[in-house]
Swiss-Prot record:
Residues given in the record as L-aspartate binding sites: 120, 124-125
Positions contributing to L-citrulline binding: 88, 93, 124, 128, 179, 188, 264, 276
UniProt binding sites for ATP: 10-18, 37, 118
EC assignment: 6.3.4.5
Top-rank EC class of the record's enzyme: ligase
Name assigned to this protein: Argininosuccinate synthase 1
Catalytic activity from the UniProt record: L-citrulline + L-aspartate + ATP = 2-(N(omega)-L-arginino)succinate + AMP + diphosphate + H(+)
InterPro entries: Arginosuc_syn_C, Arginosuc_syn_N, Arginosuc_synth, Arginosuc_synth_CS, Arginosuc_synth_type_1_subfam, AS_cat/multimer_dom_body, Rossmann-like_a/b/a_fold
GO cellular component: cytoplasm
GO biological process: argininosuccinate metabolic process; L-arginine biosynthetic process; urea cycle
Membrane among keywords: no
Organism (species): Rhizobium johnstonii (strain DSM 114642 / LMG 32736 / 3841) (Rhizobium leguminosarum bv. viciae)
Pathway annotation from the record: Amino-acid biosynthesis; L-arginine biosynthesis; L-arginine from L-ornithine and carbamoyl phosphate: step 2/3
Length: 403
């Protein structure tokens, strides 16, 4: 077997990847480069640098990917109104292909033989990372420590950390923390008491949103502007993609928008329960649907609705770089040519409700739909022929069945 000389590790600075860093150094006896993607998770970045330095890492990469994350991954997904199993806004799923892209890029830059990740053998992320690497550079070896070492539990992980003097994190109450994944689109919380779906999630698991019960008693009215399917402004102020999502996270979070307690079906075959907070994404989904409602043709809108579950499943399962996802993306992007305008929403105690929408490209005609006298010629008698033709097969079916 060819000896591995250099590894690039996707590194968060959390317990798992801190232990993996040490394990890689001991097991392979080679240089390990750490790569930390700044996706808007916040506090983790500088501590990650310090921990990597303490472990003897010479090449530490912390890359600001916030704008690329939102513009090239979140917004294309938003154009599809993507929801996995009708609920999940794919906050973790959509981040993995971007991380993998830069993991591969750094590996090529530094001449690494392999990349490594901290995903467990039970989760979806191992699949997402490795399918992405397969699509981007099959020559790069992927090391998945959770599938190779003898550590089989969180207790054993803590024992390894203690043996090697790796700090074991705790939450504000001094307890072992939940498993948390955060980026500009969402925060997910899993593990511990949440593994029992019959147990109500404790209040302290929520980090980005207030309890809707405690949200302001006065609604807040906001406006989101769109150009060709992508959000470009909030309350009339143009913003970069990352700044826009950050702004909506703040607005939605204080009104308790975007909470989801979900049991989902993992690609690998088991069910899992997670708490998701996606305030900005929830607002954008409602707003995007609102602007599409007046700018998309009926058949085009219905076709988008039909392909959306397949598109969302491809992202969830790790096929972002697969040809079928790119084919669907081309169709979705083509549909957005006239999806421009403004949507006004009311944020109130956990809800983000569309209350008005306007577009220079609108297909909505008040003159055509009005109950009053119209200037547009529409003969009500034409509906009789329309109904008769559409009822033809039903009359034949009824006659056959003796109705």
């Amino acid at each position: 077997m060819t000896k591995i000389e250099k590894i690039v590790l996707s590194y968060s600075g959390g317990l798992d990847t801190s232990i993996i860093l040490k394990w890689l150094q001991e097991t392979y006896g080679c240089e390990v480069v750490t790569f930390t993607a700044d996706l808007g998770q916040g506090e983790e970045l500088e501590p990650a640098r310090a921990k990597a330095e303490m472990s003897g890492v010479k090449d530490i990469r912390i890359v600001d990917l916030r704008e690329e994350f939102v513009s090239d991954f979140v917004f294309p997904m938003l154009r599809a109104n993507a929801l996995y199993e009708g609920q999940y806004l794919l906050g973790s799923s959509i981040a993995r292909p971007l991380i993998a892209k830069h993991l591969v890029g750094i590996a090529r830059e530094v001449g690494a033989d392999a990349v490594a990740h901290g995903a467990t053998g039970k989760g979806n992320d191992q699949i997402r990372f490795e399918l992405a690497v397969n699509a981007l550079d099959p020559s790069i070896k992927v090391i998945a420590p959770w599938r190779q070492w003898n550590i089989r539990s969180r207790l054993q992980l803590s024992e390894y950390a203690e043996k090697h003097r790796i700090p074991v994190p705790s939450d504000k109450r001094g307890e072992a923390p939940f498993s948390i994944d955060a980026n500009l689109l969402h925060t997910s919380t899993e593990g511990k008491s949440l593994e029992n779906p019959a147990e109500v999630a404790p209040d302290h698991v929520y980090q980005r949103t207030v309890d809707p019960v405690d949200a302001p008693d006065t609604p807040e009215i906001i406006t989101v502007g769109f150009e060709r399917g992508d959000p470009v402004s909030v309350n009339g102020k143009a913003m970069t993609p990352a700044a826009l999502l950050t702004e909506l996270n703040g607005l939605g979070g204080r009104h308790g928008v975007g909470r989801l307690d979900l049991v989902e079906n993992r690609f690998i075959g088991m069910k899992s329960r997670g708490i998701y907070e996606t305030p900005g994404g929830t607002i954008l989904l409602a707003a995007h649907r609102g602007i599409e409602s007046i700018t998309l043709d009926r058949a085009a809108a219905h076709l988008k609705d039909e392909i959306m579950p397949r598109y969302a499943e491809l992202i969830y399962n790790g096929f972002w770089f697969a040809p079928e996802r790119e084919m669907l993306q081309a169709l979705i992007d083509h549909s957005q040519a006239f999806v421009s305008g403004e949507v006004t929403l009311r944020l109130y105690k956990g809800s983000a409700s569309v209350i008005s929408r306007a577009s220079p490209c609108s297909l909505y005609s008040a003159d055509l739909v009005t109950f009053e006298e119209s200037t547009i010629a529409f003969d009500h008698h034409d509906a009789e022929g329309f109904i008769r033709l559409n009822g033809l097969r039903l009359r034949s079916w009824a006659a056959r069945n003796g109705r």
